């Protein structure tokens, strides 16, 4: 049973964990909330952006001289919430095969986001992550791990972290090692960013895509939703499929022995409701 209400609602309705366990002790009662089942904010309203704001994650996303940026609702709602309750359900099902008993799962989005950010907490403990945006290797602070604007107003994503990939980035940009500061010289990152920004601004996104195609520079075009639906690689894997004229993601991950069936769309209008007699 999946409980998406605020804590205490199911109990008030007479369908709480204890009520259900009395009828079916094997039942897995999965509760997914933003704040969790206990704590000062447990019964407070919130959305993805609010849960992110309390975990430290939101403060780290965006440019240094602008407000933090909400990364859609991918991180807390889906990453820290849905995926963690799913893992919890699977784990509880596996454990039930041994014990024969169900249990209650408390999946809080603030907990899930914090687990997703464990590497960042480790980096903070070592002093390599600060309470400032664009000050870390993976938050856009490094010139070789950020997004650059092209001459047509579109963008290229650069992720040339390793030295061998960084070398190919320089080749693609028409630069030599002597033209830029040392890759990991933090004191000259502003200078390197300016050099890269100037180069990327000299060509269109498609021109840069052609330059870096087939290389290991880790440089790729930033696609819109519409463009992603027609992307060559995603099309080859059938990652985005059209069902009844609607683009949607195919199931993931993929299984070798028990593959998922085709993605469908729900019936339109009142067909589905009528079919069950409503």
Regions found by a protein language model. Give the residues of each.
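Residue-level detector of anion-binding/catalytic polar loops
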Residues: 1, 26, 218
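Aromatic-enriched alpha-helical interface/lid elements that frame and gate functional surfaces
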Residues: 144-215, 219, 276
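Rossmann-like NAD(P)-binding element
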Residues: 1-11
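A structural signal for well-ordered alpha-helical segments within the folded catalytic domains
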Residues: 80-87, 164-167, 206, 271
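Conserved PLP cofactor-binding pocket of PLP-dependent enzymes
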Residues: 213-235
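Active-site-adjacent "lid/gating" segments in soluble enzymes
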Residues: 11-156, 160, 260, 267
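Flexible, small-/acidic-enriched active-site or ligand-binding loops
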Residues: 186, 243-278
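Residue-level signal for nonpolar/aromatic packing positions in well-ordered secondary structure
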Residues: 2, 20, 29, 48, ...
